[in-house]
Amino acid sequence: MENFDITLLQNIAYIFAAILFITGIKMLGKEATAQKGNVISAVGMFIAIIVTAINIVNPFVVLGGILLGAFIGSVIAVKVKMTSIPEMVALFNGFGGLATFFIAWSEMSNTNDNLFQYLLVILTIYIGGVTFSGSLIAFGKLSERLKIGKGHLLTNLFISIFYISLVSILAMLVLPMIGSLPLNFETIFYVYLALVMLGGVGFVLPIGGGDMPVVISLLNSLSGI
């Protein structure tokens, strides 16, 4: 027992959490089991968070964040009308993308000479940022708060920014492969962050409200990745 490694217990908990999460997502596909599936997925996520944070930060801080998030989410979910569920899903998914964005950003300083970790962080930042800003646009369109047509000047502008953001992520991924990072890399990185956020707007803005459920599903899948 003296040689018992706590990481073994953590890995078992991760596997159990993953099984719960995947099972819950599968149950969401049927109306009869959707509610139970949502609860099972939430339990799986809760276990994963606790196991991950137990050796990293003060557990009381983690517990406080969980309780605060659960309270805010519950209040919003209770008050929302059934016809507004798609907007709520888009909004909650966007917050998940924002969390991913900030977590990846915080890891940027730890990449150092680890090329794989650098590539992973750059890609995760893009996915998280596009998911967040794109989900906000989806929320605005579904709730009819945002009424900008496909041929609008702003729409065309943001579409162009979206294509620029695609070029920027390719450049950021290739940059360390062709040599050392430039001295002004920090400035380049901040420009990349801005392009990512604006790119998400350009990705969703030209899509009509009738296709928003498909867009939300896609963004949710990206967030899962």
Q: What are the roles of these predicted feature ranges?
A:
Residues 1-59:
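N-terminal transmembrane signal-anchor/hairpin module of polytopic inner-membrane proteins
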Residues 4-18, 55-71, 117-132, 182-195:
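Structural signature of hydrophobic alpha-helical transmembrane segments
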Residues 14-27, 45-52, 97-103, 107, ...:
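Helical transmembrane-bundle signal
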Residues 20-35, 70-89, 135-149, 199-212:
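C-terminal ends of transmembrane helices
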Residues 35-44, 62-65, 84-96, 149-161, ...:
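Cytoplasmic-side transmembrane-helix entry/capping segments in multi-pass membrane proteins
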Residues 40, 47, 146-194:
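Helix-loop-helix hairpins and the membrane-proximal interhelical loops
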Residues 52-63, 75-86, 101-115, 174-181:
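Transmembrane alpha-helix boundary signature
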Residues 82-157:
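Interhelical loops and loop-helix junctions of multi-pass membrane transporters/channels
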